């Protein structure tokens, strides 16, 4: 008997433990969200080629991903996106219809696409439970996306729904010059400051030029100053000052060297993406929840204020007599009657005019004259009868 009880107790504990594990697994499945990656970079930095390499890496490792192309002006893509802006907006037709140049055509195409981006978001959300990554390929003209209203709308919509990371692609061979390097870093800083999202700086084309010099400049202020020793111009002095200002900014960045050609650094790239996603949950999501709470509290406070005002009005009017202004009501009724009279007269006038135009009015008058004559004849007969009666009375 005791053995049976012990076995039952053990079985119960095991079952409870399994239920807890199953619940935890279910919670993890419900909480799982794909990481949204927005790829940015100057024209010629290799964004699209890098995205092709990322797509190949995901396919090779059987990692589910979802790619959205937001460049309406690209003629040919080296990969097949899941959603393509070109299927919705005809870039050349937009330029022709609105008489726009290349950049204006891209901005207008993005604006048109962003008006329906909530539908895109619905499609992505339906598949999100089976995805690990969502990747957005942006136009080559970086300012068209980062500084436009449509780019901001798309970024904020995605960031409010999924953990979002910005990837700023840098052309490494062109960054060996300290001034060019500083220009890239300033642009990355401005994007990060505007969006408040975590960022990964991807130094592309490391198969041509190694990126270690750039990481050293970011981590060691003195090494960057040494690189500027032979530049006595005002630009060199400005770059020195800016490097001191950006030193703290570098500490918030994740950086990695990659090659879109041979695939070097792709594994490390995804590691950095994971670290940046943690920063999203730690900072951006907390700020987002704070903003939502502030908005909700403000709306609740406004509702409470209106409710209190309504209660005060009800209390003040409680037991009060309602006075009816009969004079005002009578005046209103008289105005309505006067209006109706004028309306009737106007209708009669219109009817008379219509009858006169159609010839009916004349015949109507003739009928009236004949009616008057018959009445006069009857009157004369009555008069003669009365006179005859009076004569008879006098004779009597």
From Swiss-Prot:
Composition bias, Acidic residues: 343-380
Ranges of biased composition (kind: Basic and acidic residues): 325-342
Site features described as Stabilizes the phosphate intermediate, chain residue numbers: 103
Record: residues binding GTP: 44-49, 204-207
Coiled-coil segments: 284-387
Subcellular location per the Swiss-Prot or TrEMBL entry: Cytoplasm; Nucleus
Presence of the UniProt keyword GTP-binding in the record: yes
Gene Ontology CC: one annotated term: cytoplasm
EC number: 3.6.5.-
InterPro entries recorded: AAA+_ATPase (IPR003593), Gpn (IPR004130), Gpn1/Npa3/XAB1 (IPR030230), P-loop_NTPase (IPR027417)
Disulfide bonds: none
Annotated family: Belongs to the GPN-loop GTPase family.
Protein name per Swiss-Prot or TrEMBL: GPN-loop GTPase 1
